[in-house]
C-alpha cells in the first residue's frame, strides 16, 4: 500500500471540512429554531394578508425569447472565449473552424430576424406596417395569446370577486345564508 501524499491529505481535509459544514448548517437551525405546529404554519405568508388566489400569472412570450437568446449567445461567447485563449495552439484549422462557426451564427441570426422571431410588435401592427408575415397560421394571433394581463384583470374575475373568494377560501361580505334570512 502506498503512503498518503500531501495532495491526498488536502483532499481528505476538504471532504471532512465540507461534511462538517453541511452537518453544522443542517443541525444548528434545528437546535436553535423555535418549534410550533399548527394550521397557520402550513399556509403561505403574504405580508400578513390572506393569500388571494394563485401566484402564477401569464407573462408575455417576449421575455422567454430574450432569455433563450441570452442563453444561446452566452454559450457562443463562451465557445469564442475558449478559442481565443488557445488561438496560437490551434493555428489555421482553429481559425477556419471559428470563421465557419461565426458565419453559421450570422446566418441563423438573419433567419431569425427574417421570420420575425426578433420582432416585438404584434402581427397586426406588422401587417399595417407593410411587413409580410412568413410564419404561423393566419388565424393564430400570438400577440393576443401572450399578452400581459394588467393588475386590474388579475385582481377581479368576471363575477366581481377576488380569486380567493371565487375559490371558496375567503368569505364574501354578503354570505348566501345572511341574504336568504333577510328575504
Curated annotation (Swiss-Prot):
Predominant place of localization:
membrane
Task: Choose one Gene Ontology CC annotation of this protein and give it.
Answer: plasma membrane
Reaction(s) the record says it catalyses: a quinone + NADH + 5 H(+)(in) = a quinol + NAD(+) + 4 H(+)(out)
What keywords appear on the UniProt entry?
Answer: Cell inner membrane, Cell membrane, Membrane, NAD, Quinone, Translocase, Transmembrane, Transmembrane helix, Transport, Ubiquinone
**What's a single GO MF annotation on this record?**
quinone binding
Q: What enzyme class is recorded for this protein?
A: translocase
Q: Which family does it belong to?
A: Belongs to the complex I subunit 3 family.
Question: Function of this protein?
Answer: NDH-1 shuttles electrons from NADH, via FMN and iron-sulfur (Fe-S) centers, to quinones in the respiratory chain. The immediate electron acceptor for the enzyme in this species is believed to be ubiquinone. Couples the redox reaction to proton translocation (for every two electrons transferred, four hydrogen ions are translocated across the cytoplasmic membrane), and thus conserves the redox energy in a proton gradient.
The name on file for this protein is NADH-quinone oxidoreductase subunit A
Q: Which gene encodes it?
A: nuoA
Amino acid at each position: 500500500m502506498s503512503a498518503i501524499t500531501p495532495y491526498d491529505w488536502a483532499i481528505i481535509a476538504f471532504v471532512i471540512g465540507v461534511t462538517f459544514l453541511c452537518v453544522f448548517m443542517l443541525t444548528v437551525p434545528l437546535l436553535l429554531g423555535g418549534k410550533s405546529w399548527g394550521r397557520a404554519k402550513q399556509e403561505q405568508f403574504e405580508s400578513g394578508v390572506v393569500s388571494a388566489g394563485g401566484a402564477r400569472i401569464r407573462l408575455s412570450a417576449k421575455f422567454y425569447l430574450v432569455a433563450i437568446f441570452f442563453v444561446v449567445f452566452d454559450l457562443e461567447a463562451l465557445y469564442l472565449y475558449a478559442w481565443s485563449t488557445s488561438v496560437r495552439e490551434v493555428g489555421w484549422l482553429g481559425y477556419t473552424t471559428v470563421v465557419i462557426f461565426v458565419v453559421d451564427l450570422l446566418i441563423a441570426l438573419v433567419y431569425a430576424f427574417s421570420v420575425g422571431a426578433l420582432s416585438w410588435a404584434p402581427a397586426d401592427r406588422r401587417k399595417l406596417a407593410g411587413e409580410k408575415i412568413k410564419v404561423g397560421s393566419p388565424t393564430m394571433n400570438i400577440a393576443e395569446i401572450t399578452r400581459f394581463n394588467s393588475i386590474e384583470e388579475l385582481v377581479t374575475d368576471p363575477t366581481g370577486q377576488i380569486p380567493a373568494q371565487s375559490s371558496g377560501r375567503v368569505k364574501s361580505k354578503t354570505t348566501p345564508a345572511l341574504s336568504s334570512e333577510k328575504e
